[in-house]
């Protein structure tokens, strides 16, 4: 055995073995319990970053652990390869998105292999290939036939100069990223999938996701946003028109003093015909944001329409205002405004001198709305026949009255909106719909699928090549001329079903149901919590669509979800001559000084610039604080990087990248290597005989089996990989101090090392593979079994008791494991050191903590 640990040499050899033996390629096996482990697949941006490495190391640890449990483990990988970044890169590099993407895939694939991840590469998929998106297109046509797909106009960001649609990321400070023209909102026809048809089931089934983090489940519940309320009809004074409003607080209905409608509401547009101020306001609103986050913080503005609404119960007239905080695509585009009991309505009323009336008061205490609205539930007053009712009583009484008079109905609403899947981009899967010469829109016939996206294109940075090329859209259906849809799918479409395609990636159908139902649902899914409300909801939705199409049997796509934390690194910058910040890579910082609390007080880069330290921040290009995994692998080896990733932090929390920690992980592996090397060099022919062990040898063996028990639980149940590593490190300290003089000494070390390399195999597989062979095992470590705890080794013959006198440790005594308190007290009092401290004093109290501590209080 080599005395020195040489990571680059052993990692290359082990990876070649895995490749040549197709170690991680799997097929369905009815005789073995399956385990499907999946990490969210990467976008092929060009290089792996440390966030990828953390995600994929966690997945690999879980997969390898389950393999040694004897399970049939599937761990696939692929590429989420459509998307806007490829278009931008193609424009900048004067190429097309396809070659840029495929080149990146090859580079990143080699990076993944260097890190030693145990993937079944035979199942690799790239979502930008027709072999993949063909089935997505096919499925979309089936959803259309089931009535789950429809087209309607929706608002997009529009650059009037380039005459093109912009993604949200391409709008910078309200202007086009390319030409700096102010961006407008434009209504264009787009395709939608009816996720709202599954809202109730998506919400209810959250309760079945026992293996998902509570935070993700709460976020999804809030995103779906089920509410019970009343939809009521308000008339419009002086006309036969009416409009609907939905509220979850009908108890406040008697306090309505005005109604707010969206700028795009038909009533606002009607009133604007004779109201120039309103017409101008509507135009301004067309070009403003529609995101909820921005609506919450922006200035609330409005214009009186001159119209009045008729209260559905009192008949009282209240003014109708057009307001910028009401959106047409949320609810009915109109809200009843109760400034006495809603803070936004209150602030708007104060701004525009509108009446504020209180109709709810606290059950106990005084009502005060002089400074703010009273928004809690309480008891009704100033509400006529409803005075004295609490929230529930008022809800029911008011709802019943509205229903009886034909002016309202009880209704369950959802915050969730249907999924708009149209994108006016090029680099995505073409939407498989065509428009016939007579204007009829139909799905692309199955025998014409896939609708292939042309890859040999020129990107001008303005218009999608398939929109610019009028010939591409021309096709024929059943002998009739037709035009193809030139929008492409939202890239969340591809990532909503990739997990299922892995089960049968070469199948000449969307899924092979037999294979899909063997592997699905995913047993362990791993990815960032930032995907909680988009990808992870679409992922669940698509699974239910697949189920209802008869392709899968299960209700949910993944049993367990682990959301790993971000990777942080130090961030430094200096200010250049032009006053701009120049961010410097931590690898280029040559001098740092720290105070006594470890805080950086001074930093200088390799060019001599004195730097400002901004603390630990998420690794990012913008702050230039990303650490290239490949550089670290070349310097320390893949196993060291993997070990640091698992040891530095619990998986759900942020991980602070510290090269000193990486060096520590590297030293630990070298210690393990040396211990194994020293052991192998000796005569290890004597077999372990537990009947011959001394108490010291039994104690060491007990530590070995306690460690096996802890690591098994930490990885398998708790998923606390950091404490699993810490337990092995602690055991290593015991092993390094242990004598290796007798045959039984060495037999215990041999048993320990054989266990340790398997315990660490999921985390540092190259080292473990090599040491397993060096320790004389004839089978491959991948074909071995996870170490089993010898329960008899955990039984203690004796216990070490700490003896304190007046709170200070004075002695340690060994007692029989089953010794009672009287025996322990007698032995403790008889100890020479204890006698010395009890001389001339009176024992007042003796406290015994069984098996651990004897505390004597004396004065």
UniProtKB/Swiss-Prot annotation:
GO cellular component, one term: cytosol
Coiled coil ranges: none
Residue numbers binding ATP: 621
Disulfide partners: none
Family: Belongs to the class-I aminoacyl-tRNA synthetase family.
SUPFAM superfamilies: Anticodon-binding domain of a subclass of class I aminoacyl-tRNA synthetases (SSF47323), Nucleotidylyl transferase (SSF52374), ValRS/IleRS/LeuRS editing domain (SSF50677)
Motif 'KMSKS' region in this chain: 618-622
Family matches, as NCBIfam families: leuS_bact
Gene expressing this chain: leuS
Enzyme's top EC category: ligase
GO biological process: leucyl-tRNA aminoacylation
Protein name, per record: Leucine--tRNA ligase
GO terms assigned for molecular function: aminoacyl-tRNA deacylase activity; ATP binding; leucine-tRNA ligase activity
PROSITE patterns linked to this entry: AA_TRNA_LIGASE_I
């Amino acid at each position: 055995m080599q005395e020195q640990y040489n990571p680059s040499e052993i990692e290359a050899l082990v990876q070649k073995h895995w490749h040549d033996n197709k170690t991680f390629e799997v097929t369905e096996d009815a005789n073995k319990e399956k385990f499907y482990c999946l990490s969210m697949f990467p976008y092929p941006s060009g290089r792996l970053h440390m966030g990828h490495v953390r995600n994929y190391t966690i997945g690999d640890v879980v997969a390898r652990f389950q393999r040694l449990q004897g399970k049939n483990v599937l761990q696939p990988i692929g590429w989420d390869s459509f998307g806007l970044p490829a278009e931008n890169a193609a424009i900048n590099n004067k190429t097309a998105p396809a070659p840029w993407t495929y080149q990146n895939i090859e580079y990143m694939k080699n990076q993944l292999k260097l890190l030693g991840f145990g993937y079944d590469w035979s199942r690799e998929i790239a979502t930008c290939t027709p072999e993949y998106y063909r089935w997505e297109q096919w499925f979309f046509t089936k959803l259309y036939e089931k009535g789950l797909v429809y087209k309607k106009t929706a608002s997009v960001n529009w650059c009037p100069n380039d005459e093109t649609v912009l993604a949200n990321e391409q709008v910078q400070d309200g202007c086009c990223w390319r030409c700096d023209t102010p961006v407008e909102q434009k209504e264009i026809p787009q395709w939608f999938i009816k996720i709202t048809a599954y809202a109730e089931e998506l919400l209810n089934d959250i309760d079945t996701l026992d293996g998902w983090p509570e935070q993700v489940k709460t976020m999804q519940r809030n995103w779906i946003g089920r509410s019970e309320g009343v939809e009521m009809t308000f008339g419009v004074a002086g006309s036969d028109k009416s409009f609907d409003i939905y509220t979850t607080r009908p108890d406040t209905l008697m306090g309505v003093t005005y109604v707010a409608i969206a700028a795009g509401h038909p009533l606002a547009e009607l009133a604007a015909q004779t109201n120039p101020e309103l017409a101008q306001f509507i135009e301004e609103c067309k070009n403003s944001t529609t995101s909820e986050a921005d609506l919450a913080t922006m200035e609330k503005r409005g214009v009186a329409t001159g119209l009045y609404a008729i209260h559905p119960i009192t008949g009282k007239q209240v003014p109708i205002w057009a307001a910028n905080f009401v959106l047409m695509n949320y609810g009915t585009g109109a809200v009843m405004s109760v400034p006495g009991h809603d803070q936004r309505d209150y602030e708007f009323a104060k701004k525009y001198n509108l009446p504020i009336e209180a109709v709810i008061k606290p059950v106990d205490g005084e009502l005060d709305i002089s400074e703010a609205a009273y928004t809690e539930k309480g008891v009704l007053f100033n509400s006529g026949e409803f005075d004295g009712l609490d929230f529930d009583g008022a809800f029911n009484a008011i709802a019943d009255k509205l229903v009886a008079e034909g002016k309202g109905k009880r209704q369950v609403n959802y915050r969730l909106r249907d999924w708009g899947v149209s994108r006016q981009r090029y680099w995505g899967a073409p939407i498989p719909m065509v428009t016939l010469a007579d204007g009829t829109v139909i799905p692309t016939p199955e025998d014409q699928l896939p609708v292939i996206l042309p890859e040999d294109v020129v990107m001008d940075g303005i218009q999608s090549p398939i929109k610019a090329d009028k010939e591409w859209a021309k096709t024929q259906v059943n002998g009739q001329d037709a035009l193809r849809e030139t929008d492409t799918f939202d890239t969340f479409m591809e990532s909503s079903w990739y997990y299922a395609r892995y089960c049968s990636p070469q199948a000449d159908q969307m899924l092979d149901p037999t294979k899909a139902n063997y592997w699905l649902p995913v047993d362990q899914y791993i990815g960032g919590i930032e995907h909680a409300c988009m990808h992870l909801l679409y992922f669940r939705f698509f699974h239910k669509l697949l189920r209802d199409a008869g392709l899968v049997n299960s209700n949910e796509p993944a049993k367990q979800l682990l959301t790993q934390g971000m990777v942080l690194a130090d961030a430094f910058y200096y200010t250049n001559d032009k006053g701009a910040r120049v961010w410097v890579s931590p690898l280029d910082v040559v001098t740092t000084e720290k105070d006594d609390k470890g805080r950086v007080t001074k930093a200088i880069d390799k060019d001599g610039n004195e730097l400002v330290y901004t603390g630990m921040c998420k690794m990012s290009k913008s702050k230039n604080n990303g650490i290239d995994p490949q550089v670290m692998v070349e310097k320390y080896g893949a196993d060291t990087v993997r070990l640091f990733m698992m040891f530095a932090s619990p998986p759900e929390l942020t991980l602070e990248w510290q090269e000193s920690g990486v060096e520590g992980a590297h030293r630990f592996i070298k210690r393990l290597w040396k211990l194994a090397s020293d052991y192998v060099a000796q005569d290890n022919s004597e077999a372990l005989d537990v009947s011959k062990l001394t108490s010291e040898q039994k104690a060491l063996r007990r530590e070995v089996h306690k460690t096996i028990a802890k690591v098994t639980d930490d990885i398998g149940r708790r998923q606390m990989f950091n404490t699993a590593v810490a337990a092995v490190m602690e055991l290593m300290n015991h092993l390094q101090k242990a004598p290796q003089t007798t045959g039984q000494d060495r037999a215990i070390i041999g048993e320990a090392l054989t266990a340790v390399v398997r315990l660490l195999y999921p985390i540092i597989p190259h080292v473990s593979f090599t040491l397993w062979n060096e320790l004389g095992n004839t089978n491959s470590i991948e074909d071995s079994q996870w170490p089993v705890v010898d329960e008899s080794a955990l039984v203690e013959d004796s216990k070490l008791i700490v003896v304190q006198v007046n709170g200070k440790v004075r002695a340690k005594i060994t007692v029989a494991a089953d010794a009672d308190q009287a025996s322990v007290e007698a032995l403790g009092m008889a100890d020479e050191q204890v006698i010395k401290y009890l001389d001339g004093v009176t024992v007042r109290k003796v406290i015994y903590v069984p098996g651990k501590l004897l505390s004597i209080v004396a004065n």
